């Protein structure tokens, strides 16, 4: 039985946030098509994960060197391990998030920091870093109210680009990406843009 991990990084309700609606649509469509799959859903805002900083980094280093950890470091390392192992054990992963202020919401950056661990999702070699998580099937769902398809705007899109870059670093070089954009910039076509985008989400979910 496949293990599927759904990761949502938006705490706004689906009726107010397109990426939340994309997530909801994908999950419901996938569950309907795959009733016997083992599914785990992570709502990153609800988890309120501690920032990845000195305590977790020092704890990870000390553990790798066989050094004794403080209680605080033990707790931080255990939290990182929990989510890292969950990701590594998943056969399929879906990320859903908006573009806020040109990038992803902060909880997703924290979560990705937990996952980006040398020896686990990538390793260092003489020829540079090498990804270790390439066997996973991944879908990226992104929403942005403005249209970032133009030559002027494209470099400012640091949400989907950030996530797919990190995935590539981990060896996941071909994630399927669905983006809904421009629904705020083009209010006269907003409903059509969202509806067509959600149809694409359903198609991807049905065959995932």
From Swiss-Prot:
Q: Which GO terms describe its molecular function?
A: electron transfer activity; FMN binding; oxidoreductase activity, acting on NAD(P)H as acceptor; oxidoreductase activity, acting on NAD(P)H, quinone or similar compound as acceptor
What are the record keywords, sorted?
Flavoprotein, FMN, NAD, Oxidoreductase
InterPro entries under this entry? Flavodoxin_fold, Flavoprotein-like_sf, FMN-dep_NADH:Q_OxRdtase_AzoR1, NADH:quinone_OxRdtase_FMN_depd
Q: Which reaction does it catalyse?
A: 2 a quinone + NADH + H(+) = 2 a 1,4-benzosemiquinone + NAD(+); N,N-dimethyl-1,4-phenylenediamine + anthranilate + 2 NAD(+) = 2-(4-dimethylaminophenyl)diazenylbenzoate + 2 NADH + 2 H(+)
Offer one Pfam family short name for this entry.
Answer: Flavodoxin_2
Cofactor(s) listed: FMN
How does the cofactor bind to this protein, according to its record? Answer: Binds 1 FMN per subunit.
Q: What class of enzyme is it?
A: oxidoreductase
Tell me if Nucleus is a UniProt keyword of this record.
Answer: no
> What is the E.C. number?
1.6.5.-, 1.7.1.17
Q: Does the keyword Oxidoreductase apply?
A: yes
HAMAP family per UniProt: Azoreductase_type1
Question: What is the purpose of this protein?
Answer: Quinone reductase that provides resistance to thiol-specific stress caused by electrophilic quinones. Also exhibits azoreductase activity. Catalyzes the reductive cleavage of the azo bond in aromatic azo compounds to the corresponding amines.
Quaternary structure?
Homodimer.
As for family, the record states: Belongs to the azoreductase type 1 family.
> By its UniProt entry, which NCBIfam families does this protein fall under?
PRK13555.1, PRK13556.1
- Name this protein carries in UniProt: FMN-dependent NADH:quinone oxidoreductase 2
- What is the scientific name of the source organism? Bacillus cereus (strain ZK / E33L)
Q: What gene is this protein translated from? A: azoR2
